[in-house]
Regions:
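Catalytic histidine neighborhood in serine/cysteine hydrolases
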Residues: 217-237
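Conserved acidic catalytic loop of the alpha/beta-hydrolase fold
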Residues: 68-85
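Catalytic histidine-centered segment of alpha/beta-hydrolase-like enzymes
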Residues: 234-243, 247
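Flexible "cap/lid" loop of the alpha/beta hydrolase fold
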Residues: 98-103, 107-137, 142
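Gly/Ala-rich beta-loop-alpha elbow adjacent to hydrolase catalytic centers
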Residues: 89, 93, 97
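Conserved alpha/beta-hydrolase catalytic His-Asp/Glu region
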Residues: 121-124, 136-195
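Short beta-strand/loop motif that positions the catalytic acidic residue
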Residues: 196, 202-204, 208
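Conserved HGGG/HGGXW glycine-rich cap/lid loop of the alpha/beta-hydrolase fold
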Residues: 7-59
Length: 258
């Protein structure tokens, strides 16, 4: 597990409480654009970053593990001299958040886990997807991915934004995407969920076909200080489809636990 220096952007009050935003497979830090104004206006120092293998972060050869992705977060906090942060992660980002909550709990004030899962099988599905991407590129999986990310109604109402997200996925380096599929294929976060001590907000999209509400329920049942919110209409990228609801939930959680 060797950390890489991931690409990041910091916005908001330099002295505000830090909030780290960690994104999904196939995304880059632009996926959090709907959260930035709400968090910075409320006085937070917002740190967004690209997962390794994604966006403008380095692409070391895979496979990656969640320990690798978690080590990148700890190294980023060290680089920014942040002792503890509020961590908000969606999907793969939420998995990274659970890893940090389990193995480096002292680095977290709170955890917000959006549209994620502690166990997302079958493993063969991730191996198959990685093989497709290595053979044909990320463009081969981008259209199917946006169909999981957004409800049909949202896609119909926002064709340009849907295309932009599809382009974001298609521009993700194939090796980075495939190597992160391996991290999901091999992850095992369930047994240690009770070790997460951070106050945890779990948010699920009611219409999410990728990490459905039942997965969020399992996390909320196992994490001692967790609370579950199911919101809709929203598919996998609920932070984009329902930014107002998600922002209010995040801000409420941070304020309750500062
Ligand atoms: O399959 C998808 O695109 C949904 C997803 C699973 C993990 C992740 O980060 O995104």
């Amino acid at each position: 597990m060797t950390a890489v220096d991931v690409h990041y952007v910091v916005e908001g009050s330099p002295d505000g409480p830090p909030v780290l935003l960690s994104g999904s497979l196939g995304s880059d830090l632009r996926m959090w654009a709907p959260q930035v104004a709400a968090l910075t206006t409320a006085g937070y120092r917002v740190v967004r970053y690209d997962q390794r293998g994604h966006g403008r972060s380095p692409v070391p050869p895979g496979p990656y593990s969640l320990a690798d992705l978690g080590a990148d977060v700890l190294a980023l906090l060290d680089r920014l001299q942040i002792r503890r942060a509020h961590f908000v992660g969606l999907s793969l980002g939420g998995m990274v958040g659970m890893w940090v909550g389990q193995y480096a709990p002292h680095r977290l004030h709170t955890l917000t886990l959006c549209c994620t899962s502690a166990e997302l099988g079958p493993p063969s599905g991730w191996a198959d997807r990685a093989a497709t991407v290595r053979a044909e590129g990320t463009g081969a999986v981008a259209e199917a991915a946006v169909q999981r990310w957004f409800t049909p109604q949202w896609r119909a109402a926002h064709p340009e934004r849907t295309r932009d997200f599809q382009d974001m996925i298609a521009s993700t380096p194939a090796e980075g995407y495939a190597a992160c599929c391996a991290a999901i294929e091999t992850m095992d976060l369930t047994a240690r969920l009770p070790k997460i001590s951070a106050p945890t907000l779990v948010v699920a999209g009611a219409d999410d076909p990728a990490t459905p509400p039942a997965h969020a329920q399992r996390i909320a049942d196992a994490v001692p200080l967790a609370r579950l919110e199911i919101i809709g209409p929203a598919a996998h990228l609920a932070n984009v489809e329902q930014p107002g609801i998600v922002n209010d939930l995040i801000l409420g959680h941070l304020k309750e636990n500062s």
